[in-house]
C-alpha cells in the first residue's frame, strides 16, 4: 500500500507540472484525465505483507508429527527383522557345519549336552531293544538330505514310516541315553520284521545331540510306545533313561530292513522374511496416508 501511494503522489505531481507548462490543459479536465490514464503505470495490487493466517494453516499440528511415529516405527521394525533374518540364516549355516565336524567324546557331566545341540559325539554300549519306542509318523530323509514325499495312494514308495528310539546302555558308565536309531517303513515297525537290525552285542556309533520338543498345538496325546514328538520327559520316565536324546548318523553298512540313520534336520524357525515384508508394507502404506492427509490435506 505504501508503494502504491508513492506512485500516485508522483503521478499527481507530474500532472500539476504539465498543467503549468501547458496552460491550455487547465480548461480541459478530460485531457488531464486521459493523460493520467495513459501515463500511469499498471498498479500492482498485491501486498508484500505475509498472510499469517494462511501460513499457520499450512503448519503441521503436533498431532500430525505424533502420527508420523507409526510409519517410522514400522520401518524400524522392518530393519530389525532384516538383521534377525541374516543372523538366523548364519546360525543355521553354523549348525549345519557342526554336523560335518569330527565327533567328540560324551562329556562326563551329561548336563553339558544342553549346550551341545547338533554336535557329533561318539558313544559305546548296547541297545535295550525290549524298551524300544516309535516316533512319528515321519518321512524318510535320504542320505543326500532330501526328504521323501508321497501321495495318499503311494504310501509304499512315499517314505512314510516311523523313527525307532531305543534306550542305550553306555559301556563306560551306568547311564542310559535315548538313541534315535533311524527310520523304518510301516512294514518294518515291529522288531520281528527286522531281526538283522536288532543287534545284541556292544556297538560303537556316532550320533548327533538333540533336545526335546515342545508339544505342538492341537497335537493329541501319545498312545502306548508311539510318540508324536520328542517328549523327552515322558520317554525318559518310561525307560529310566537320562534326559539325553541322540540321533544316530547314517551308516552305509546298515543291515537290511534295519533303521536308516541320518534322520537329523536342522530345524530353526525362520519366519523373518514374512515379518520384514509385513513391517515394510505397513510403513509404506502409513507413510502414504500420512503424506496425503497431513501434508497435502487431501480428504478421502
From Swiss-Prot:
Ranges that cross the membrane: 60-82, 271-291
GO cellular component: mitochondrial inner membrane; mitochondrion
Recorded topology in the membrane: Multi-pass membrane protein
Family membership noted in the UniProt record: Belongs to the SURF1 family.
Its biological purpose: Probably involved in the biogenesis of the COX complex.
Residue pairs linked by disulfide bridges in the UniProt entry: none
Organism from which the protein derives: Drosophila melanogaster (Fruit fly)
Coiled coil: none
GO biological process, one term: instar larval development
Mutant phenotype after disruption: Lethal at larval stage. Larvae show reduced locomotor speed and response to light. Results in smaller muscle fibers with mitochondria defects. RNAi-mediated knockdown is lethal at larval stage. RNAi-mediated knockdown in the developing CNS, in the eye and antenna disk from early larval stages shows increased lifespan with reduction of COX activity, increased succinate dehydrogenase (SDH) activity, reduced locomotor speed and response to light.
The entry's keywords: Membrane, Mitochondrion, Mitochondrion inner membrane, Transmembrane, Transmembrane helix
Protein's name in the database: SURF1-like protein
Annotated localization: Mitochondrion inner membrane
